[in-house]
Swiss-Prot record:
Alphabetized UniProt keyword annotations: Disulfide bond, Hormone, Neuropeptide, Secreted, Signal
Signal peptide (residue range): 1-28
Tree of life domain: Eukaryota
Disulfide partners: 35-72, 52-68, 55-81
Role, per record: Inhibits Y-organs where molting hormone (ecdysteroid) is secreted. A molting cycle is initiated when MIH secretion diminishes or stops.
Pfam families, sorted: Crust_neurohorm (PF01147)
Any one Gene Ontology BP term: neuropeptide signaling pathway
Gene Ontology MF annotations: neuropeptide hormone activity
Protein name per the record: Probable molt-inhibiting hormone
Family the entry assigns: Belongs to the arthropod CHH/MIH/GIH/VIH hormone family.
Cell location: Secreted
Cellular-component GO terms for this entry: extracellular region
Species name: Metapenaeus ensis (Greasyback shrimp)
Tissue specificity statement from the Swiss-Prot or TrEMBL entry: Expressed in the postmolt, intermolt, and premolt stages of the shrimp eyestalks and the brain.
Amino acid sequence: MYRMPMRFWLTAVVMVVVGALLLDTASASYIENTCRGVMGNRDIYKKVVRVCEDCTNIFRLPGLDGMCRDRCFNNEWFLVCLKAANRDDELDKFKVWISILNPGL
């Protein structure tokens, strides 16, 4: 029976780990790059993202989370989600937070 050298297996494992780390970093930066003002405002970002997460849990629609986050929460889906999460009374606060996450708009 043919045995693969230990060096081959070690190289394969290292490549898989590095690939997984790069993929994870790339997907995280894609999410964060949709909002230019995230850096330094992660606490605000987490509060706004929570609305989209709650909405996704309420409706269970595929892709709803992405539609809610589209254009850094500056869209109609976010407003629908805010209402669905019974947080529409906080609309003014969320508008301020979204403007902080979207500097220059």
